[in-house]
Swiss-Prot record:
Similarity section: Belongs to the sugar phosphate cyclases superfamily. Dehydroquinate synthase family.
Pathway membership: Metabolic intermediate biosynthesis; chorismate biosynthesis; chorismate from D-erythrose 4-phosphate and phosphoenolpyruvate: step 2/7
Record HAMAP family: DHQ_synthase
UniProt protein name: 3-dehydroquinate synthase
EC number: 4.2.3.4
Cofactor comment text: Binds 1 divalent metal cation per subunit. Can use either Co(2+) or Zn(2+).
Necessary cofactors: Co(2+); Zn(2+); NAD(+)
Subcellular location per the Swiss-Prot or TrEMBL entry: Cytoplasm
Keyword Membrane part of the UniProt annotation: no
GO molecular function terms attached to this record: 3-dehydroquinate synthase activity; metal ion binding; nucleotide binding
Residue sites binding NAD(+) per the record: 70-75, 104-108, 128-129, 141, 150
Amino acid sequence: MRTLTVDLDDRSYPIFIGSGIRQQKALFDDAIHGKQVMIVTNETIAPLYLESMVSMLSVDYKVDTCILPDGEVYKTLETYGMIMSALLEAKHNRTTTVIALGGGVVGDMAGFAAATYQRGVPFIQVPTTLLSQVDSSVGGKTGVNHPLGKNMIGAFYQPQAVIIDTETLQSLPQRELSAGMAEVIKYGLICDVPFFDWLEQEMPELMALDNDKISEAIYRSCLAKANVVAQDEREGGIRAILNLGHTFGHAIETEMGYGNWLHGEAVAAGSMLAIDLSWRMGNLTEQDICRTVALFQAANLPVLPPAEMTVECFVERMALDKKVLDGSLRLVLLGALGDAIVTSDFPMEDFNSCLLDALEASKQASLA
């Protein structure tokens, strides 16, 4: 088992990474407050892992469960209300601990419920998808979607611990594994060129879920995110670099309908748009572009946006991005490979031509 810490002074917490560790009760005992536990999961994960976790924790705690429908389309205030109702109906008090057992949607909603139930109760993240293990479970972002925009309703609220069991990846559909790999690749692009180089060499074994290699990828991803979050918990500055590809990507997810494009797929296509724009601004070489395209494709990820979208769709959706400041759109771009920047200083001509060219290439590809 490997351990690292998200250093946030009195709100610091550990991240545990290992195979089979969801069954190590001591990890939970150290993070549970009081004697009540609410496990929030979904209909896909419940048959796989819920019974064993309830059995393990019921020895010392009153354990209740809340099983949600599965999918990004259910990341709504209505589903969040199901968690609140479950807590109230089972008479959970302020000393209860919420456990999020599932992927990013479960973690975001359970975390938001914990942040707001009786003005805040502790929670533990037990992420079961690669995307949630390397990204959404770490850093304290919680919330739900709105029809007009992704993650528009939420809170910053840190967990007591993140328990990453790599064994759960064995049940992950290939498409979900690829989606998670988009966030892994992102860390190499924004801040860690040696990691990017390593991913180029190891991607076939990572996609085959070699345990040592996937554990290393998760550890290095979490370490990169923990270092950024420790510097800027609430995204007032450097933390925004973690959103490479997300401004374009969220526009894709919202426009195409939540769940039709997985988050990681949208991030991959969005990252390529950001990288193309960075290249047009003279920050990257053609070799950088080719290497990045090849790496995303090795992970079975899209490198072009949906052919159905238009420049106008992107502009309208991106205007609601949380990084917009005083009416100006700010993008996460690359100053160089491994060096992300957040800027509103980009030529609109390059921005428009980047989108137009990518959309045209996507249309041509769809006709081929």
